[in-house]
Amino acid sequence: MINQTAKKILKALSFDGVEVEAFRHMADLKRLDPMKIFYKKVDEKIYNGSHAVPIRIFFPSEKSFRESEEKKHDIQDKKLLLFIHGGGWVTESIDNYERICARLANATGQYVVAVEYRLAPEDKFPAGLEDCYAVAKAVYSGDFMLNIRPENITLIGDSAGGNLCAALSLMARDRGEFMPNRQILIYPATYNDYTENSPFVSVKENGSDYLLTAGKMQDYIDLYARNEEDKKNPYFAPYIAVSYTHLRAHETR
């Protein structure tokens, strides 16, 4: 239960409308969070056609970093989290999620690879998804500095990142180039309609007064889509896929 004081504050901050630049500046404030744990990172790029997709690799320990550099150790049996950040396909970055990814690596003992996919509205669907797919394909196929067995790789993403994890898994199944074994989808945005026409009771009951409003969600959807036809594409909204056969097990939080 939310106490009454907190509820009043949330209600005051719950408004519709997405101001792209203002929201991006607010998201950047995450960088002020001080890090008090060891972490080592390396920035690399993976190409999606002619576009270089920045990625950031987080190492769980100094030893794991040395092993990857020296290439004297077989790291295929190590584990890796391929992390896709949230932000409504419009805000956030691997810089803003650095603390989360570093803590994930530290807490799990796994490598973490974060993807800097292109954002809407400058680059609408499916640009960001194709960036994530290109990175996933390289990581799962071993065409990458960390040669980890595919069965030891987990896709993980929150909100819009959860959407992109689910969508690229559908895309991977359909294209037949690789297949993720595991997904962790953290409150994934998998549908295409947060208006009064939404079939979900939760949108009607909780679509206001809780900071992220249904109106904001719909604005993010509209900023991401090029047109109404995009919204009918299961790669845009994985919930509407006709079939989920031949997809591996996933976990939703």
What residue spans do the PLM features occupy?
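A glycine/proline-hinged amphipathic helix-loop "lid/cap" segment
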Residues: 1-61, 69
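Short beta-strand element of the alpha/beta-hydrolase
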Residues: 78-85
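Short substrate-entry loop that stabilizes the transition state in hydrolases
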Residues: 87-101, 105-108
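Catalytic nucleophile-loop/oxyanion-hole region of alpha/beta-hydrolase
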Residues: 93-94, 100, 114-152
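Primarily recognizes the serine-hydrolase "nucleophile elbow" in alpha/beta-hydrolase
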Residues: 142-145, 151-198
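Hydrolase active-site cap/lid region
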Residues: 174-228
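Active-site nucleophile elbow and catalytic-triad environment of alpha/beta-hydrolase enzymes
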Residues: 223-242
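Conserved small/polar residues in nucleotide/adenosyl-binding loops
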Residues: 245-252
